[in-house]
Amino acid sequence: MARIVVITSGKGGVGKTTVTANLGMALAQLGYRTALIDADIGLRNLDLLLGLENRVIYTALEVLSGECRLEQALIKDKRQPNLVLLPAAQNRNKDSVTEEQMKFLVNLLVNDYDYLLIDCPAGIETGFHNAIGPAQEAIVVTTPEIAAVRDADRVIGLLEANGIKQIKLLVNRLRPQMVKANDMMSVADVREILAIPLIGVIPEDECVIVSTNRGEPLVLEKNLSLPGLAFEHTACRLDGQEIEFLDLQSYSRGPLKRLRRFFLGSSTN
């Protein structure tokens, strides 16, 4: 039976969907059958970030209405057969799928996959509550900015109130030089405020923009960028592996391939 993890954030624009795409692909590369559920109805982007937008024929909404079978709506990634996407409808609003319907979709998938990752709409409105309904665990994505952290704190409280106790923190778009100059909150600052376990730290890098524009998750790179390696490590931590966090202050791009072999084994290259 699958682990059901919702990827959420308080504030929009913190990179939540990028996180979902890369964690999903990384888990699939680790050998886990992984299904990604785009719950951001009306504003779907997960298909774009995975490069699957031209293959969307049916969405979750057609499954719920009986217009198609679940298997017809699921899109299998040709680069990684362990990964499938259930896309959201683009021309509907967030109220089009209820919490009970989201639970129904998850129940259709839960016995056939090892991981279900739900890409949750930003904010705390109806779409958020519908998306977190089926989840057992949550990853809260924030950037090290005070507004994003404050919104993340609010989301953590709502997740706990809805019975989700396994909540992890992912700090995205960290700029080590700005932290060093005291112009950005450090990871320690964010952890002190939010008081939940840290699962990942992803540095800011222009390669992330290139990756999203191309529809190619960073973890597919043969020679991993620093963010790509950080995403792989995050997936391994989600899987229960103990992996030290990278020292982003002093890290250079040169040893990435060597470190990847050390942490993940040559079979993942």
UniProtKB/Swiss-Prot annotation:
One of its GO terms (molecular function) is ATP hydrolysis activity. The keyword Amino-acid biosynthesis does not apply. GO terms for biological process: cell division; negative regulation of cell division. Pfam families: CbiA (PF01656). GO terms for cellular component: chloroplast; cytoplasmic side of plasma membrane; cytosol. SUPFAM superfamilies: P-loop containing nucleoside triphosphate hydrolases. It is found in: Plastid, Chloroplast. Keywords: ATP-binding, Cell cycle, Cell division, Chloroplast, Nucleotide-binding, Plastid, Septation. InterPro entries: CobQ/CobB/MinD/ParA_Nub-bd_dom, MinD, MinD_FleN, P-loop_NTPase, ParA/MinD_ATPase. It comes from the Eukaryota. ATP binds at residues 11-18. ATPase required for the correct placement of the division site. Belongs to the ParA family. MinD subfamily. This is Putative septum site-determining protein MinD. It comes from Guillardia theta (Cryptophyte). The lineage of its organism: Eukaryota, Cryptophyceae, Pyrenomonadales, Geminigeraceae, Guillardia.
